[in-house]
Swiss-Prot record:
UniProtKB keywords: Nucleotide-binding
Domain of life: Bacteria
One Pfam family cited in the UniProt record for this chain: DUF520
Protein purpose: Nucleotide-binding protein.
Protein name: Nucleotide-binding protein Spea_3114
One function term, GO molecular function aspect: nucleotide binding
Family matches, as Gene3D superfamilies: 3.30.70.860, YajQ-like, domain 2
Stated family: Belongs to the YajQ family.
Length: 161
């Protein structure tokens, strides 16, 4: 019986490349010339620092654009609501969603079961295992998961026939 796992992970290498490209773009941008702004990546958290709140939001947009170019889904970003003001700079922390939370996993299982596909779905820690009789059923589940608006990107691995 074919089976697969639905997971939510961020490719660490591509994320680092996106941050490096963002830093390169930041150095070349005219609106940031002469301003104190930086993008730093450490321990799976990106810290954006700028002289005002508007510039922090622009840094988020730069990072989002570079992540899209590197095929890292921007939906995995978890940006702070408010910029922290310290001294003469504002800073934002951007964390990345890893693993499928229990609540999101339950919604995904319900979505798959409501679709009336002939598959078995089970939650296994931070991933969801889908087993079916036909490979086509699993491909329909993949399409369903991609179309779902659960606020988190999904990847599919461990595909077995």
């Amino acid at each position: 019986m074919p089976s697969m796992d639905i997971v939510s992970e961020v490719n660490e290498v591509e994320l680092r490349n996106a941050v490096d490209n963002s830093v390169r773009e930041l150095k070349g941008r005219f609106d940031f010339r002469g301003k104190e702004a930086s993008i730093e990546y450490k321990d799976h958290v990106v810290t954006l620092t700028a002289e005002d709140d508007f510039q922090c939001r622009q840094l988020v947009d730069i990072l989002r654009m570079q992540m899209s170019k590197r095929d890292v889904d921007p939906k995995s970003m978890d940006v702070d609501d408010k910029a922290v003001h310290s001294g003469k700079t504002f800073s934002l922390k951007v964390k990345f969603k890893e693993g499928i939370e229990t609540l999101v996993a339950k919604k995904l299982v319900k979505l798959i079961k409501d679709s009336k596909l002939k598959v078995q779905v089970s939650i296994q820690g931070d991933s969801v295992r889908v087993t079916g009789k036909k490979r086509d059923d699993l491909q329909q589940v993949m399409a369903l998961a991609r179309e779902s608006e659960l606020g988190q990107p999904f990847q599919f691995n461990n595909f077995r026939d």
